[in-house]
């Protein structure tokens, strides 16, 4: 079941963010992500969780979009803890000037991946964005994250720009 998160779930969001980055960069310290959550997480940046529904073995059906309720169902395994997270913010298209959804984080716990949960969450947020009048959705993904790149490509996402970084040394 997809459940709309609350701004009271800041610490759980932080745990999921840290897991996201630790999966990709296991030797790094991500304590600074607390500041990111503190700065950007609000009622204007919705959060959704994927959780079990009902008794063990009970499964829902696939669904899409908010449509005024807080729950959407689709088959997922039993779990005591959320098994996936989707956090969305707002951005302005710098070419056209239109507001649009921007995905901050999509994370599925490793043992629940490749079961359609990420795809279902992406379709869910696409429908949510359409309902609020958005014409596009943006996100950033690390080039080294091949599974995520494959998912986004399969869903029709295209590269619009490249984020380029140059590491600077304090020594000369």
Regions found by a protein language model. Name each.
Residues 112, 116-124:
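Conserved acetyl-CoA pyrophosphate-binding loop and the N-cap/start of the following alpha-helix
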Residues 122, 130-140:
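Conserved GNAT acetyl-CoA-binding A-motif
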Residues 109-111, 115, 143-144:
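Active-site acidic-Proline motif in GNAT/NAT acetyltransferases
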Residues 119, 143-161, 166-168:
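Conserved active-site alpha-helix within GNAT-family acetyltransferase domains
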Residues 1-55, 68-105, 109, 122, ...:
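Acetyl-CoA-dependent GNAT
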């Amino acid at each position: 079941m997809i459940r709309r998160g609350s701004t009271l779930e800041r610490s759980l969001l932080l745990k999921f963010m840290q897991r996201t980055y630790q999966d990709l960069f296991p030797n790094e310290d991500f304590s600074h992500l607390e500041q990111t959550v503190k700065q950007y997480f609000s009622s204007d940046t919705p959060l959704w969780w994927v959780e079990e529904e009902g008794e063990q073995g009970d499964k829902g059906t696939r669904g899409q979009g908010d449509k005024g309720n807080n729950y959407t169902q689709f088959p997922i395994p039993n779990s005591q803890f959320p098994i996936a997270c989707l956090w969305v913010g707002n951005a302005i298209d710098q070419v056209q000037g239109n507001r649009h959804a921007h995905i901050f984080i999509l994370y599925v716990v490793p043992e629940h991946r490749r079961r359609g949960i990420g795809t279902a969450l992406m379709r869910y947020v696409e429908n949510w964005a359409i309902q609020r009048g958005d014409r596009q959705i943006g996100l950033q993904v690390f080039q080294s994250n091949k599974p995520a790149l494959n998912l986004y490509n399969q869903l029709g996402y295209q590269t619009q720009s490249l984020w380029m970084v140059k590491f600077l040394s304090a020594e000369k």
